Amino acid sequence: MNKPFSCIGIVGHPRHPTALTTHEMLYRWLTAKGYQVIIEQQIARELKLEGVQTGTLAEIGRTADLAVVVGGDGNMLGAARVLARYDIKVIGINRGNLGFLTDLDPDNAQQQLADVLEGDYFVESRFLLEAQVCRQSGTPRIGTAINEVVLHPGKVAHMIEFEVYIDENFAFSQRSDGLIISTPTGSTAYSLSAGGPILTPSLDAIALVPMFPHTLSARPLVINSSSTIRLRFSHMRSDLEISCDSQIALPIQQSEDVLIRRSDYHLNLIHPKNYNYFNTLSSKLGWSKKLF
């Protein structure tokens, strides 16, 4: 039996009234069941709750042992990059579109979450990527990503030229619109749209997926997650950027390299006991059903 939870954080950035309804339902239901509940500050303001315990994401990460994220995958990504630094488990209620990371159906969330609170769940450890934009001297600019790190032009889309080194060994040079470096978690996101492979969550692997390469021989490459990836630029005619989960942008200047590696942090994502990854793929991607 899994360890029971005692302190639960409610997280999310509500964009419409139905999401706020879910936040309020969760708060009142969990407090009625006797749990200590910390609600993210913005949600408490939106709901006009008074006399409640509120906190930032970091404070929830330090204090709670479970965070419930209400929203879509974008909300989950933003919260997860912070919560992954702490010893806290995370589960999501889907109020977005696809919801690869948010398992719970909002119409049945209370019953599904009740089962989880009784210990009827399992934990998946999802690793993050760390991207550093650095030069020979000076402090690097650092970002982390749950899904992917993307090299792309900063303003106007155009072809860029760069070299890729894996564990400091030259791998290939490329002329393309950019490069997606994806975790298994991100393999069903931007990487999939660019023709990248789907990596099951338990794989210790990273996918390198070219974006519109100017050669037919450029193909996605899957490497061990323990590898370090370095991107080098011989000359830069315009601003380039590294983006993390399409939420954090790090500009790249002349004479700077980009270093990408597996982060020391990981996300403790929990699922209901009846969760099946391949059922999720089938339903979200519209795969054909079983024939017999």
From Swiss-Prot:
Claim: NADP is one of the keywords in the record: yes
Protein name, entry field: NAD kinase
Positions annotated to bind NAD(+): 73-74, 147-148, 158, 175, 177, 188-193, 247
Gene Ontology annotations of biological process type: NAD metabolic process; NADP biosynthetic process
Cofactor: a divalent metal cation
Highest taxon, organism lineage: Bacteria
Keyword Cytoplasm: yes
